[in-house]
Every structure is written in structure tokens, then in C-alpha cells.
């Protein structure tokens, strides 16, 4: 019996070289959370601060599950894809620093991308391996956090994507379908870092290449889809959002510069309408690549983020 596309991809990926397997193993192990052994703290300070009394809804109901009231990696705007699949597998490790008054955050994340079926299908998994945060009392109180000193280490959610090439190199623009599941593996919901709840999004991305006589490639890009995630609102347990993005690539001599504006528009209007500008510069070598990105939050996600990525390029699965 034929395996589902997603499982088939992992089966094929298992035959990749040892370097790739070891990196993925490290990626998964780093996301495993160790059980807490510390003594249960006294929550009197939180109860007094927010006027909580016995019989009122539990503290989880006070956390606002939206990007404006969680950490920078809790409900991020999905990456703008380019309407087509890359031919080579990639393993990427990224160091990020998020600048925001009162909540400076640093993290290390990982990504694995595996194309197969002659470049018609690909799978991707990614997530924050470890995050360090240190926010001030004002941020703590605004987000109803129960982390009294606002300092700690958190582990991120894991994302699984399946991508299918619908059109490529035709008169019609390149078109890529992406469906992504977000797990609830993120930790420290009590510190308002992650939502401790699943979500998913699906989108179509489009692009068209235009090349000048000088060899400069210009590629406009667009994205349209939806994003849905679970909340703690007992009357509306799910928030749905319109996902959007547009931008362009400039490519020449293994260099690529990208600029875009992306975001999503939630229906609850409780800090669930993030919008951001994205700028990236990538340099490709034979078997590796370097990527530098800057993200500038405009609305409901006000971090300014720098990312530095190292990428290993491997042969595609067959």
C-alpha cells in the first residue's frame, strides 16, 4: 500500500547521509522538555496583582493567545515562500536576537528541507531549539505572566510543512501550495512565551522571473492563505486569520536580496493582526550558503529582529 506523501518523505529522508541524520536527531532532542522538579512557588504576588480570588477562572484563562501578548516566537508570521521548490535538500541553523523595549530575546532555531518526486513535492520542519528571555515588570504584568523575575529559558514549537508544486516555468506564474501544522511543544506558557496549543496554516505563493540583459533577475512574489490557532477563549476556542504577503527578489552571481511585507489579520482583534517588513541577503556557495535577515515589526508584533543563518546544501531525496 502506498505511503502518504508526508510519511513517504520522511522514509526517503532516512536514507540521507549521516550528517543530516545527526543534525535532525539533535534538533528533536533539543526540543524535549525535562520535567520540573522545583518546589511549587507561592503565587500570592500574582493573585494580589491581578485581583484573583478563589473561584475565578484559572490563570491560563488570563493569558492572551495572540502575537502582541506572547514572546516573539509564539505566533510568528509564516515565511513568504517563492512559488517554487528548491532542488537541493537544506539543513539550516539560525541565531536570532529580538530587540524590543522591555523584552530582549535571543534564540537558536533549526530547519530541515527535503524535496523529492523530482522536485514536485517537499517537506520541511523547523522550530526554535532554545530561547532566552529577560523582560521587565511592565511586560510581565501586561501579559499576565506568572514568571515573577521575567528571566528564563524556553523551548519552541515544532512546525511540519508539506509543499506541492502546482505550476512552474510556464506562462502562468510559479505556484506553490504549502500546508503546515504547528505543534504544542513550546514551553513556558506561564511566562507568556508560547501558547501551549496547536495551530495550522495553508497558503499559495506565486512568483514570476524577469531577467535583464545584464543577468540581473527580478522576481515579484505574492502569498495568500489562512492561519488558524487554538486559544483559551471558552466561547471561541479558535482564532482564524487571513494570511498575506508580497515582496520581490533581486538575484545576480549567487547573491540574492529580498524585501517583503507580510502579516496576518485575525478576527478577534486582540493583538492578532501582526504586520512586518522583512529584508534578507543570501550568498550561495557550492555546498553551503549564508543568510542574513532583518525583520521590523509594524503592528501587533513590534520586535526588531536580526537573524544569521548557516545552510548546508545536500543532494535531493530520490
Feature map (PLM): residue ranges:
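Structural signature of outer-membrane beta-barrel domains
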Residues: 98-100, 130-132, 182-186, 225-231, ...
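Detector for outer-membrane/organellar transmembrane beta-barrel domains
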Residues: 195-266
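Transmembrane beta-barrel outer-membrane domains
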Residues: 101-105, 151-157, 193-199, 215, ...
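Outer-membrane beta-barrel proteins
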Residues: 81-83, 97-100, 148-150, 190-194, ...
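Outer membrane beta-barrel transmembrane domains
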Residues: 136-138, 146-147, 235-236, 242-318
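Transmembrane beta-barrel domains of Gram-negative outer membranes and organellar outer membranes
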Residues: 39-185, 200-207, 211, 255-260, ...
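Cleavable N-terminal export/targeting peptides
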Residues: 1-62, 317-318
Amino acid at each position: 500500500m502506498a505511503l502518504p506523501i508526508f510519511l513517504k518523505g520522511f522514509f526517503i529522508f532516512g536514507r540521507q547521509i549521516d550528517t543530516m541524520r545527526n543534525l535532525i536527531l539533535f534538533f528533536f532532542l533539543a526540543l524535549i522538555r525535562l520535567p520540573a522538579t522545583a518546589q511549587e512557588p507561592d503565587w500570592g504576588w500574582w493573585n494580589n496583582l491581578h485581583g484573583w480570588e478563589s473561584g475565578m477562572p484559572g490563570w491560563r484563562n488570563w493569558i492572551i493567545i495572540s502575537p502582541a501578548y506572547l514572546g516573539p516566537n509564539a505566533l510568528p508570521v509564516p515565511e513568504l515562500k517563492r512559488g517554487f521548490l528548491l532542488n537541493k535538500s537544506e539543513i539550516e541553523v539560525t541565531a536570532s536576537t529580538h530587540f524590543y523595549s522591555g523584552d530582549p530575546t535571543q534564540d537558536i532555531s533549526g530547519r530541515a528541507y527535503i524535496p523529492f518526486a523530482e522536485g514536485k513535492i517537499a517537506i520541511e520542519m523547523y522550530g526554535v531549539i532554545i530561547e532566552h528571555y529577560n523582560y521587565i515588570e511592565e511586560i510581565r504584568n501586561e501579559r499576565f505572566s506568572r514568571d515573577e523575575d521575567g528571566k528564563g529559558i524556553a523551548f519552541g514549537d515544532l512546525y511540519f510543512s508539506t509543499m506541492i508544486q502546482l505550476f512552474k516555468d510556464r506562462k502562468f506564474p510559479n505556484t506553490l501550495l504549502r500546508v503546515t501544522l504547528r505543534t504544542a511543544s513550546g514551553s513556558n506558557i506561564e511566562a507568556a512565551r508560547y501558547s501551549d496549543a496547536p495551530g495550522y496554516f495553508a497558503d499559495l505563493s506565486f512568483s514570476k522571473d524577469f531577467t535583464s540583459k545584464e543577468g540581473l533577475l527580478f522576481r515579484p512574489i505574492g502569498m495568500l492563505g489562512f492561519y488558524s490557532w487554538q486559544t483559551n477563549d471558552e466561547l471561541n476556542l479558535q482564532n482564524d486569520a487571513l494570511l498575506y504577503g508580497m515582496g520581490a527578489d533581486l538575484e545576480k552571481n549567487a547573491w540574492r536580496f529580498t524585501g517583503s511585507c507580510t502579516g496576518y489579520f485575525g478576527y478577534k482583534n486582540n493583538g492578532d493582526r501582526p504586520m512586518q517588513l522583512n529584508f534578507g541577503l543570501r550568498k550561495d556557495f557550492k555546498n553551503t550558503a549564508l543568510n542574513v535577515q532583518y525583520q521590523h515589526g509594524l503592528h501587533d508584533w513590534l520586535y526588531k529582529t536580526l537573524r544569521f543563518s548557516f545552510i548546508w546544501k545536500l543532494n535531493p531525496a530520490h
